[in-house]
Amino acid sequence: MTLDISKYPTLALAETPDELRLLPKETLPTLCDELRTYLLNSVSQSSGHLASGLGTVELTVALHYVYNTPFDQLIWDVGHQAYPHKILTGRREQMPTIRQKGGLHPFPWREESEYDTLSVGHSSTSISAALGMAICAEKEGQNRKVVSVIGDGAITAGMAFEAMNHAGDVHSDMLVILNDNEMSISENVGALNNHLARVLSGNLYTSIREGGKKVLSGVPPIKELVRRTEEHLKGMVVPGTLFEELGFNYIGPIDGHDVVELVKTLKNMRELKGPQFLHIMTKKGKGYEPAEKDPIGYHGVPKFDPAHTSLPKSSGGKPSFSNIFGDFLCDMAAQDPKLMAITPAMREGSGMVRFSKEYPEQYFDVAIAEQHAVTLATGMAIGGYNPIVAIYSTFLQRGYDQLIHDVAIMNLPVMFAIDRAGLVGADGQTHQGAFDLSYMRCIPNMVIMAPSDENECRQMLYTGHKHQGPSAVRYPRGNGMGTPIESEFTALEIGKGRLVRQGEKVAILSFGTFLANALEAAEALNATVADMRFVKPLDEALIRQLANEHDVLITIEENAIAGGAGAGVIEFMMQEKIMKPVLNLGLPDKFIHQGTQEELHEELGLDAKGIEQAIRHYLAK
């Protein structure tokens, strides 16, 4: 449903940045108010990311007003906050389609718009990319400006600091804007720093910092304190000390909701040479009281009525796999005081809220630091504890070296609870959990499990927790199938699958939650169906039996076919000279766009009807 733009008269004049730059500066506050209201009304009708964008309205307007985009290059880290950017860059009328199949991409996307300089989705990539672009811009000599906008969560990641460290050394012209909406860096900041930011006086910063050190050092009672905690004190007086030490000229913090002051500051900073760092303070959810009070709850929202003060509650029913994991953690921790649960900033999404409250001493949120999360678990395992790393499939990619080098080589008992395995739906290419079976299956010592339903998931989590080596349980986004969940824990036999349906000629080997689809297809084909359970080690005896008793084997998984579970079946059969035709069904060799999970399964032929058709087509060859 398209909104009536006549209700937003100033916004109607700014469909593109070129039009925006024609507006008088005094109209910008009105534009921001209309843009914020438009964003709220649009997302409430379509669903999507809300609170982050509400907090970056003034910054977005100011950036496009000051910088000559798309010639000047603007990069949004992660991209949750980029909805206002999409609205102002010619995509306003398409906003109702965002995150939907065939609609606007959920994040900035190069194929979608020339204003989207970098395709994003994962955090903390913007500064590295901006530096690369800035280096090239200097070589071209066209006075192109490069700006990176990064949040206070994303900037905690190691990659961001690696990039800033290099940028300070290379000294290219670029601007990093820290969108700080949590007061995480500047709790002790007062009026002095706001004044210094407005006058943009780096020399004054330096004199105050150095002069303050001299004054404090001359006072005997605190002379020793200053000597021992000099860096801490500098950080209290000047929050940008860290960034200045990395080679940036630090300005801020300033009010990120004063669009006129932002424009003045950005115009001044646009002409500065070398790496610049602007620290702005914003409020996530700005302008919509429920989102201001609950920015986490309103980070990503379903369709809702903005007139109501709360989001619609889910209808209940079948539990999500994330909640099954959360319940497992609580139940297991009641028995095992050495259980340690680690998450890289995914407490809510991974179903760990209850556990974090009931067992706070066994819960560790390491922020956006996947590499650290994995090796932290290594240390805990060496210390005699039982760590569980709760992580999305797409984010485990970032800790791959640590998985191999720090866990698997030492054969340590670390379990990975891999959420969002398979197609996640609306977040698109950057978030699909398409590769974990492929990138884990080649690692020695790994035990990899793929449950077919919620009870099997619970028992596999228990199996992995008790296993004396590295293990992984991968499960999809969304709710289970309604299978009754046994409260009692039962360890599964490692590497053993089970026959679910006996048929003739065709045997379907199902890895994971496509089992229900496989069974439905098997009814039409009178095929045998096996729930393989383990991707590694494979149930080789069961594969041999099925190959001996059937003419054709079909494997199905919600993972890339290349290198996945089905590839493992073929490798085993070729090694054993078992010459039977095998059809691998799974995700094709391409990045899968956004859409609902159901839409994507149907499009890729992975629903029951598609599986049946694929098998019939294969048999007809």
From Swiss-Prot:
Residues reported in the UniProt entry to bind Mg(2+): D152, N181
Source taxon at top rank: Bacteria
Enzyme class: transferase
GO molecular function, one term: magnesium ion binding
EC number of the protein: 2.2.1.7
Cofactors, names only: Mg(2+); thiamine diphosphate
Positions that bind thiamine diphosphate: H80, G121, H122, S123, G153, A154, N181, Y288, E370
This protein's UniProt keywords: Isoprene biosynthesis, Magnesium, Metal-binding, Thiamine biosynthesis, Thiamine pyrophosphate, Transferase
GO annotation, biological process: 1-deoxy-D-xylulose 5-phosphate biosynthetic process; isopentenyl diphosphate biosynthetic process, methylerythritol 4-phosphate pathway; terpenoid biosynthetic process; thiamine biosynthetic process
Keyword Cytoplasm found: no
Cofactor: how bound: Binds 1 Mg(2+) ion per subunit. Binds 1 thiamine pyrophosphate per subunit.
Catalytic activity: D-glyceraldehyde 3-phosphate + pyruvate + H(+) = 1-deoxy-D-xylulose 5-phosphate + CO2
SMART domains referenced in this protein's UniProt entry, alphabetically: Transket_pyr
Any one cellular-component term (Gene Ontology): cytosol
Pathway of action: Metabolic intermediate biosynthesis; 1-deoxy-D-xylulose 5-phosphate biosynthesis; 1-deoxy-D-xylulose 5-phosphate from D-glyceraldehyde 3-phosphate and pyruvate: step 1/1
Alphabetized HAMAP family for the sequence: DXP_synth
Binding partners and assembly: Homodimer.
Record family assignment: Belongs to the transketolase family. DXPS subfamily.
Entry function: Catalyzes the acyloin condensation reaction between C atoms 2 and 3 of pyruvate and glyceraldehyde 3-phosphate to yield 1-deoxy-D-xylulose-5-phosphate (DXP).
Name of this protein: 1-deoxy-D-xylulose-5-phosphate synthase
Organism: Vibrio vulnificus (strain YJ016)
